[in-house]
Each structure stands twice: as C-alpha cells, then as structure tokens.
Amino acid sequence: MAGRRGDPDEQLLTTVRTIKILYESNPYPNLEGSRQTRRNRRRRWRARQKQISSISERLLSACLGRSAEPVPLQLPPIEKLNLNCDEDPGKGTEGGLGSPQISVEPCTVLESGTKE
C-alpha cells in the first residue's frame, strides 16, 4: 500500500524534499568584496534563512496536522521523585512513562564517609 494516493509518509517525504530545495536555493554568500559589502550580504542571507525557516515550519505543520511547538510534558513534583533501590533489575519499566516510581522509604546511595 506504499503507492496509494494520500500516503502520509510519502507526503512527508515530499514536504521534506521541498524544504531541502528551499534551503539549497539560498547558499552562503561568497567572501569577496569589502567588509561592508560582505556584512550586507550576510544580513540579507540571514533574512532569507529566517523566511525559509518560517515557510518550512508552516509546511511541516500543514503536513503533520499539528503545531511545531512541543506539547508540555506534565511531570510530578521533584520532591516526590526518588531512586528506587529495591526495584528488581529484571522488571524494567513496566509502568511506562506516565507512572514514575515513588519510593516511600529513602534508600542509602552513599554511606556516611566510612571506608572499609
């Protein structure tokens, strides 16, 4: 089904190719001329790069159907987070990303300055 019309992956690849062509159409300015001339070329180049960047963001948001801004991740308060020393190494993270491990008893990670 890779060739069907409206395939989201193919549409994304086409959008990325278009963005690549946009960036390639604006090469870095050459280093010839006086200092002021080079400065003006770089200033115009940066302005074009900004325009290309904003166009690229608009293309990607239209293609992906969402905004370019990341969705904020809700994290629990840092005071409640703790290292869980009692966790079985074979279990892994079965709880997933949404359920952080909160230990009731504080575990001792470093001993109090005694050497053996």
From Swiss-Prot:
Residues 18-26 are annotated as: Homomultimerization. Its main location: host cell. A motif (Nuclear export signal and binding to XPO1) lies at residues 73-84. Asymmetrically arginine dimethylated at one site by host PRMT6. Methylation impairs the RNA-binding activity and export of viral RNA from the nucleus to the cytoplasm. Phosphorylated by protein kinase CK2. Presence of, and maybe binding to the N-terminus of the regulatory beta subunit of CK2 is necessary for CK2-mediated Rev's phosphorylation. One of its GO terms (biological process) is viral process. A motif (Nuclear localization signal and RNA-binding (RRE)) lies at residues 34-50. Residues 26-48, 84-116 are annotated as: Disordered. It is found in: Host nucleus, Host nucleolus; Host cytoplasm. InterPro entries: REV_protein. It holds the Pfam family REV. Belongs to the HIV-1 REV protein family. The RNA-binding motif binds to the RRE, a 240 bp stem-and-loop structure present in incompletely spliced viral pre-mRNAs. This region also contains the NLS which mediates nuclear localization via KPNB1 binding and, when the N-terminal sequence is present, nucleolar targeting. These overlapping functions prevent Rev bound to RRE from undesirable return to the nucleus. When Rev binds the RRE, the NLS becomes masked while the NES remains accessible. The leucine-rich NES mediates binding to human XPO1. This is Protein Rev. It comes from Human immunodeficiency virus type 1 group M subtype K (isolate 96CM-MP535). The lineage of its organism: Viruses, Riboviria, Pararnavirae, Artverviricota, Revtraviricetes. The gene is rev.
